[in-house]
Amino acid sequence: MLKLEAPWGDDTRSWGPPFQSGFDGEEVASYFLSCNRGKTIETVNIKTEQDRIRTLIGEVDIVIENFKPGTFEQIAGEIPDNVIVCSISGYGQHGPRRDEVAFDLTMQARSGIMSITGDADGGPAKVGVAWIDVMTGMNAVSSILAALYQRERNGKGARIDISLWDTALAALVNQGHNALAGITPGRMGSAHPNLVPYKAFEAKDGWFAIGVGTENQWHKLVAALELDAPDHWKDNSARIAERSEVEATVQEAVASIDRSTLERLLIGIPNAPVNTVNEALADEQTEARGGLVEHEGVMTLASPLRFLQPSNEKSDV
């Protein structure tokens, strides 16, 4: 992958602290390192080197650009018929907001995601990582793969229009459909609008998440924690109707139990301690799955993709 940066470099090189030695030995923000493993980086001046850019476009299979709508066409000129171009922007290539600038924060705000994130009695909050940015990239990859498959059949490239806005709206999933059904979603902390219990509870030594999604899991929870639960709570709809009572009952039970004991008690029920990021990186499953990899002297998060060969041996891809 060839990445073209402005002569002064990608802005995220300075998005710190923290800073650390990068893949080329230059000190850059850790943020930059999280997004640029495995890329060959060159600098280019889009105002004076358009011929070079157009030559490069003619030599590649895929171009990904995130200029303001309309800018790429001025720079790139005529695109070869077999090249796939994926444009990523804030609001897409058309519509009344197409020329507005956007960040992940503003997407989470305008899309309603911040209105449903955070404690019920607190202010709106954003997800702790650039969630919309990440999912937009995943949507771009999916679209590019589909375009490559199509090109194998007809030999033609494609122009793909991916936006943070479309991604944010699609990411509303069940909450968006709750709104379409006439219910106005709101902030619920770690709780779930359609499942109870499904949230983080305060255990003896920290926060602990428990999620019940089936009647069988509910019965297991009642038995494991010896809950004093009325029979009608076996139905999720009844538990939703009496959410505060159900959650209070579970909270009372877990308050005196430490998290490691809860994990042992709740086998078969989705559960987990609320870890810090450092605890997650040190988890035995992270090591077993190769979740951290060293790349050119820098420790990085591994790709989540795992390819198994027919022999069940891990692929080198």
Where are the language model's segments positioned?
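Flexible, small-/acidic-enriched active-site or ligand-binding loops
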Residues: 293-317
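Oxidoreductase and adenylate-handling cofactor-binding alpha/beta cores
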Residues: 137-157, 170-181, 222-229
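Conserved Rossmann-fold dehydrogenase catalytic segment
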Residues: 93, 121-129, 152-168, 186-193, ...
